[in-house]
Amino acid sequence: MSPSKVFIFIACIMAGLAGLSMVLPGRVVYHEYELRWPTLAEVLGIPNTSQQECEEIEEEIEASLPEPQDTILPEPTKVIEEPRIEVPRVAVDSTVDSRVFLKSFYASLDQADTKKVRVLHYGDSQIEEDRMTQQIREALQSRYGGSGAGLLPLAQTIPSRTVRQRLVMNGKQIQPAQGPQRYMVYGPKRTQREDGLYGVMGQVAVMNDSLVSGSEEVIAICTPQDNNARYNTWRIFADSSVHYRTSGDSVYLSGKGSVYALSQESKTGVIVDNIPMRGCLGTVFTKIDRQQLSSFYREQNVTLIIMQFGGNAIPFNRNPSTISSIVKGLREQVRYLQSCAPEASILFIGPSDMLTQENGEWITYPMIPYMDRLLRKMAMEENIAYFSLFNYMGGAGSMARWKENGLAGSDGIHFMRSGARKAGNAVVQWILEGEEMER
């Protein structure tokens, strides 16, 4: 094709797109889903006139027109507007400090000098790399004793800044995906199993040569990356058919069976486990075998379970009824964990502020304030503590300020490491202040 024809072709395409931008409103909404594109005015940099300014201009034009003289006006053109979904009001009792529901956890801390006290921190991608959990762990261990990073999966696909993990199989270092077959309760269907035996971390590695050749002889090397992650004992959670020995930072495993977790910890003090579940809504715990969870929580003296979920529901839902259904599902998970760990306290950390672009501007996703209040209400009704990360940050639009200060990423959703430290410190300070009030 000659250069002139290419130019004409491109010009026609651009003209067609410009025409669509002039005619179409800049977005199409189907149920709760929305597709956006820039209008012609935005592309050309033409200032956007506010709704108030438009109304004032219309009033001035109408005032300048002569009074009608029995003129028959045509029927106005019907404009189909995007339906606005009313967000229901959520009444929350703000007079009760939800830390009152952490009493059993606070009481367990008195025993930390003679026995192990375990805290589990479940969450979505906001806590990957040990983010936020690290600050909670360091503060609790500094005050009540304890050491080690706690639970680790056999194959760590998402690197942690606290512990560097490597796998050796068939005499050479391999990528986690090349190791024993992994199953995850929060993963795609092909990675799930029917028996519900995922273990306390919601994932399991199966050593079996028929699944992955050479996977019945594995070495896991787990090296702490800072002094705060040092430990004095190993714990291995696996089937009895899996044999192991430890040497320094290495675990040598052999046999055929399931490995649910490794743990670097101490025999007394506080152990805080980081359990991220990427892409998870938090509605998967009921798929994990009840007996398996109950046994771990009881035998490992789990006295606090932290759940940090909800953010993954926000970008894909604009309907309050959908958000309400998700919170209902989270309520079921809370009740399930309460039944598995009746002696433990539960703390729910709500989603942070999250931003989306609308007409070229960053705004808070409209469902976040609603979900935050629904979660707070649910927590009070289920007798669990609630920390509003959204309110701590400053409410709607606060993520933009965190971005400006280098605390949040360019996506307007995830924290930078500095932001995660700030949020983690805020959570543990809030917890410790409650403990001091109890005394």
Predicted segments with their positions:
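Short, Lys/Arg-rich N-terminal segment immediately upstream of the first membrane anchor
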Residues: 1-4
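Hydrophobic membrane-insertion alpha-helices, especially the h-region
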Residues: 7-25
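Catalytic His-Asp segment of secreted/periplasmic serine-dependent ester chemistry enzymes
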Residues: 26, 290, 352-439
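Juxtamembrane proline-rich low-complexity "stalk" or linker regions positioned immediately after a signal peptide
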Residues: 27-80
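Long, contiguous interaction/targeting segments characteristic
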Residues: 65-83, 91, 95-162, 416-418
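Conserved, compact domain cores that house catalytic/ligand-binding motifs in diverse enzymes
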Residues: 115-121, 128, 132, 269-362, ...
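Conserved SGNH/GDSL esterase-like catalytic core that processes O-acyl groups on lipids
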Residues: 128-328, 414
